[in-house]
Amino acid sequence: MKRPIFIGITGGTGSGKSTIAKEIYRQFGEDCIAMIEQDSYYKDQSHLSMEDRVKTNYDHPNAFDNNLLVSHLESLLNGHSIQKPSYDFSIHNRIEDTTKVEPKEIVIVEGILILEDPRIRELLDIKIYVDTDADVRIIRRMVRDINERGRTMESVINQYLNVVKPMHNQFTEPTKKFADIIIPEGGHNKVAIDIIVAKIKEVLGKYE
């Protein structure tokens, strides 16, 4: 198998990262793409009580097991399959279930802090930052966390103001400078997606 290309998609919470990833997935097909979500690599917290898990700052780089993520990306780069961990947000902990991910022609790595770690940046062939207005992002996060993660509106708002927003400004926003492509206004920018698809095809051609 020829060397896979690694595409990093980052941006603030609710910016439209998943929308971009899904559109690339749609254009190239499941046979060509492996998906790696940084959210799957939150650290195991089995040693903590639920009360302490809830206090974890999930928007800080220390919340992620980047050593495992880097190891898995290197395995995919070398043509080996991995067992991607699973994280249950309702219990704030990793669970035993894993997902087997085979090496593919294109590996998409998606998450709020993937460009913060230089080891991950080094592995990425194309680095994308999805730049979306903060008001839009908080609304999207509220809808997601209430509907999918069993959160209350009050808890989501408090977390956004006290953790998410300051962490975004301190850690996520500054990584924009590392991006090759910056997409304004979220994941519904067709021109930007067309440019990304063309760039992916160009890079794929180099590895033929």
Curated annotation (Swiss-Prot):
Pathway: Pyrimidine metabolism; CTP biosynthesis via salvage pathway; CTP from cytidine: step 1/3; Pyrimidine metabolism; UMP biosynthesis via salvage pathway; UMP from uridine: step 1/1. GO terms for biological process: CTP salvage; UMP salvage. This is Uridine kinase. Keywords: ATP-binding, Cytoplasm, Kinase, Nucleotide-binding, Transferase. It is found in: Cytoplasm. The gene is udk. It catalyses: uridine + ATP = UMP + ADP + H(+); cytidine + ATP = CMP + ADP + H(+). The lineage of its organism: Bacteria, Bacillati, Bacillota, Clostridia, Eubacteriales. Belongs to the uridine kinase family. Its EC number is 2.7.1.48.
